[in-house]
């Protein structure tokens, strides 16, 4: 779980996505691989970072060079300085391990719905910083395309966790899959609800991101196939999102703490 070493709770009131790094995540992945496991599942989400996974990549031997040919470890604030990426030094043991990455959003790397614009503000970025971070990720995308021979910037989920989704594909050869779908498959959810009358689920806030494949909608989509009723108890929700949730298979939404609204 990347949030355990690169998550928002760890920085508290010191949020700055220009400086935070995923280096520790890479160290953990490498340590797990060296322990002899055959499969590693990396959970994305709740990160304080916006470095596109460059820190994690550097921790396993990937090298980044600036325009002067100097090697450095990029952070969110310096991804714009990346000129070249060298994958040849990556730890060979990672090629012997299956790495699966779970994420619950389908955002692209950059742009209006990308990592920086959608998630930057919650990591401490103001409007100007969001634009700076987005340009950095855009440059990283260019460098990745040059390094691996294909453009992955529009692959759903590459914008997850400060574009860590893109880094997992490009630097670790991982595949991305929806976290909620993985969990539901693991617990045999479809069988579990076969004789249920109601399915009660919940989320902190039902918002636009929820509608892009998080827990509530993931469950609703499965339940809809069996004509099951889904009740969502959420911390808060806007009326527009509630209406869309109904369209996507949710039977009823009950916010326990509705935000004040004008009449």
Can you annotate each of these PLM segments?
Residues 1-44, 48-263:
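N-terminal loops that bind phosphate or other acidic moieties
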């Amino acid at each position: 779980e990347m949030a355990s070493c690169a998550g928002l709770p760890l920085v508290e009131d010191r949020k700055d996505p220009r400086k935070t790094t995923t280096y520790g995540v890479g160290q953990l992945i490498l340590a797990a691989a060296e322990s002899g496991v055959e499969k590693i599942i990396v959970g994305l989400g709740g990160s304080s970072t916006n470095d596109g996974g460059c820190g994690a990549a550097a921790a396993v031997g990937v090298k980044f060079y600036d325009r002067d040919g100097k090697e450095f470890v990029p952070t969110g604030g310096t991804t714009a300085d990346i000129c070249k990426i060298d994958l040849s030094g990556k730890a060979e043991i990672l090629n012997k391990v299956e790495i699966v990455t779970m994420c619950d959003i389908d955002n692209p790397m950059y742009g209006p719905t990308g990592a920086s614009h959608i998630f930057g503000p919650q990591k401490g970025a103001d409007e100007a910083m969001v634009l700076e971070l987005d340009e950095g990720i855009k440059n990283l995308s260019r460098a990745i395309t040059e390094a691996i021979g294909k453009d992955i910037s529009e692959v759903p989920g590459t914008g997850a966790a400060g574009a860590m989704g893109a880094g997992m594909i490009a630097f670790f050869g991982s595949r991305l899959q929806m976290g909620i779908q993985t969990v539901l498959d693991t617990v045999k959810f479809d069988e579990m609800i076969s004789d249920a009358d109601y399915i009660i689920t919940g989320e902190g806030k039902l918002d636009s991101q929820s509608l892009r494949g998080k827990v509530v909608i993931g469950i609703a989509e499965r339940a809809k196939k069996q004509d099951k009723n889904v009740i969502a108890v959420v911390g808060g929700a806007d009326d527009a999102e509630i209406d869309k949730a109904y369209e996507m298979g949710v039977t009823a939404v009950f916010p326990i703490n509705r935000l004040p609204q004008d009449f």
